[in-house]
A protein has these predicted regions:
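Hydrophobic N-terminal alpha-helices or hydrophobic patches in metabolic proteins across all domains
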Residues: 1-168
């Protein structure tokens, strides 16, 4: 199985599930190794950035740890993107009538010709971050769930969260 962190470079491995701009929500099936169409977002909604997961991790909801990749172009489902964590949102989501921790992590791709990408969540434009927060809240509400954001954190805390979620 692909590790969460590249053994040579230490870069975070991210597998893309859903491309930026898509209304389709794709999910990876570990049993078959295939991606399947799991949801259609309501009219007028689309993923603001590509969404994926970190392999060899397990979040509190039983799935691999989710990440949103801050990158201008849509990325194809199934591709591996060497990435750097820039932070996350402390969040809780309703699941089976109970509120459970379900933080959101953010990454940027590591590219040789990078144009000075953000290194910390606070480097993002405040309006952009507000729009991303609104996306998560609205998306969950339209799926019949409640989503609450309780703060933000930087790359160090994000890396600790990933390390705690590594499958043993």
């Amino acid at each position: 199985m692909l590790p969460a962190f590249d053994k040579k470079t230490g870069d975070l491995n991210v597998i893309i599930e859903t491309p930026k701009g898509s209304r389709n929500k794709f999910a990876y099936d570990e049993t078959t190794g295939l991606f399947w169409l799991s949801k259609l977002l309501p009219a007028g909604m689309a993923f603001p950035y590509s969404f994926g997961f970190i392999p060899s991790t397990r979040a509190g909801d039983g799935d691999p740890v989710d990440v949103m990749m801050i990158y201008d172009e849509p990325l194809f489902p199934g591709i591996l993107v060497p990435s750097r964590l820039i932070g996350g949102l402390k969040a809780r989501q309703s699941e089976g009538g109970k509120m459970k921790q379900n933080d959101r992590l953010f990454t940027v791709p590591i590219l040789p010709q990078e144009y000075s990408p953000p290194r910390h969540l606070r480097d993002l434009d405040k309006h952009l971050l507000h729009e991303i927060k609104d996306f998560f809240i609205t998306y969950q509400r339209l799926m019949g769930k409640k989503f609450e954001i309780h703060g933000e954190f930087g790359p160090k805390e994000a890396k600790l969260l990933v390390q705690k979620s590594l499958k043993k």
